[in-house]
A protein has these predicted regions:
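Residue-identity detector for glycine
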Residues: 9, 19-20, 24
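N-terminal low-complexity, intrinsically disordered patches enriched in charged
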Residues: 18, 99-101, 137, 163-167
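Basic/polar N-terminal segments that are highly enriched at the extreme N-terminus
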Residues: 12, 26-28
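Short non-domain terminal segments
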Residues: 4, 23-24, 40, 52, ...
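Anion-binding (especially nucleotide phosphate/pyrophosphate-binding) glycine-rich loop
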Residues: 28-156
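FAD-binding subdomain of flavoenzyme oxidoreductases
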Residues: 147-149, 158-202
């Protein structure tokens, strides 16, 4: 049986069950990634039920939670150097992982990158902040525009990536700029509403 992970009804990955020679190859790739990650924080063979809201799913070979953008860059560079598959996730909502597991590095942008603060009349959030937390913080500060997000269980990063929306509101209506990791570099980008479409972003 193939190993699968799904998000929004789409395959995240499909890795066939392997025999002796291929299993040895995968083990070698796993060891290569472990060495490349070095002192970066990661765990091996973590069950997906630990990080999905459905609390189901088999083991993923590597699981990591960066504390900041620099650590995220380092993790992505390590995986790229080994040609190892990577999936970046947030709160684990809308995510199903097969009980068979997935051979990949799962990077969760979570509580370690979940800061919420203000810069004048602008709300600044880490990608790991819960969207509902950001919405409540905005209301408490008297800022309008994010009320529709109060009941959404995902993270700010996930909401930006898919241009989340509900009740007539969308992230693109309030998003002004983002800090992204792009080709191993950290960059800030100004965002225009036209850059985001229905459940999609650039």
């Amino acid at each position: 049986m193939p190993r699968h992970a799904f998000r929004n009804g789409k395959h995240l990955n499909a890795v066939p069950e392997t025999g002796g020679e291929e299993t040895g190859f995968l083990m070698e790739k796993n060891d290569m990634l472990a060495r490349a990650l070095g002192n970066l924080p990661f765990r091996r063979n973590v069950r997906a039920r630990e990080f999905t809201t459905f609390r189901i799913g088999g083991p993923v070979t590597f699981f990591a939670e960066p504390k900041d953008a620099d650590e995220l860059c380092a993790m992505l560079s390590a995986a790229r150097s080994c040609d190892y598959p990577v999936y970046i996730i947030g709160n684990g909502s809308n995510l199903l992982v097969s009980d068979s597991g997935v051979e990949a590095l799962f990077i969760r942008i979570g509580a370690r990158m979940a800061g919420v603060g203000f810069d004048g009349t602008r709300l600044k959030c880490g990608a790991g902040a819960l969207l509902c937390t950001a919405a409540k913080a905005a209301v408490a500060e008297g800022l309008a525009g994010l009320e529709w997000a109060a009941g959404i269980p995902g993270t700010v990063g996930g909401a930006v990536a898919m241009n989340a929306g509900a009740y007539g509101g969308e992230i693109k209506q309030v998003l002004k700029s983002v800090t992204v990791v792009e080709c191993g570099r950290i960059a800030k980008k100004i965002v225009h509403a036209g850059d985001l479409g229905y459940r999609s972003s650039v």
